[in-house]
Amino acid sequence: MAGYYYRQLDREKRGVYDAMLAGMEALAPGIRVPRLDGPELSDIYLRLKLDTPLLFYVTGFQYRWMPGADHVELLPEYLFDKGKIRQHRQAVAARLDRLARPLQGKSDRDKELAIHAFILENVRYDKLKKPYSHEIIGPLTQGVGVCEGIAKTVKALCDAVQLPCIVALSEAAPERGVKYRHTWNVITVDGQRYHLDATFDNSLQRGTLRYDYFNLDDRHIFRDHETLVLPLPPCTADKGYYYRPLSFTKPEDVENRARQALRKKQPHFVFHWRGGGLNREILTDLLNRCAAAAAERGKCVSCSVNTAQAVVQLDFTDAPAGDPLLVQQPDEGNEL
């Protein structure tokens, strides 16, 4: 099926997109396309790369034309020579097949959970931002990636298990400390579209998988995500949010669930707070209640909080932590 960004183009630009795709898949040194200006060609190329994560070996292009000609010649820039590209394509295809095969026949939700878990359990953020970390070969073959490579990997895995997926792209905002553009995904699960940011969840892990950005609607994702570069379809559903069953409005409910976790000897308890602004006063009250419950069982408690998404992780330990309250900032690699 044609990619989401392809479907937003007019007929002429679709023709350029198709020619780019065919030429790059064939590893052509030059690709002839109808003459458009540079920004238009760059926009089509961006859409192609977001739609097609398997073009991991293409890093950009230049172009040239003759005066008066009705076409231009694109000159793709490849990350490797042809022999290496073919080797990497085979390795990536085999890796995707191994990961996708056990998910065939599973529910949409189970597929999404497995893909999310793969990223969190197998990929670390590459603060050096190597070229391959921006593409799927970083997460799939090296175990490292930046947000772009991670989001493209999520899409490649979703494509492999027939789960509709878009790579979302937002602007940088240097005035707010966001130095780079950011990428994540929009996934259709059981007929409903949701935002999924595996990079942000990956950056929040402290001994347990996190799902702060698992199936958010537009209202919640844009609390800490910037303006989109390319428009996305609306995401208005909230029933798929991972922490929905663990979303509380009363401190006593948090305390009761913390006691359950302690009885079950669980080292961590993560929940969502929707009882008003998650300020220091409320956090202190929640932490004091849970600390008293932990002390009854000879345990200490500390917490880390994602204030933008109002998600709190409680950690139960035998010895007190240095700082009982940690305010987390997701995706530290994206900050100035």
Q: What are these regions, as identified by a protein language model?
A:
Residues 1-95, 262-263, 270-271, 277-336:
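Linear, non-domain "peripheral" regions
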Residues 213-301:
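Metal-dependent nuclease catalytic core centered on acidic motifs
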Residues 136-150:
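A short, highly charged nucleic-acid-interacting micro-segment common to nuclease
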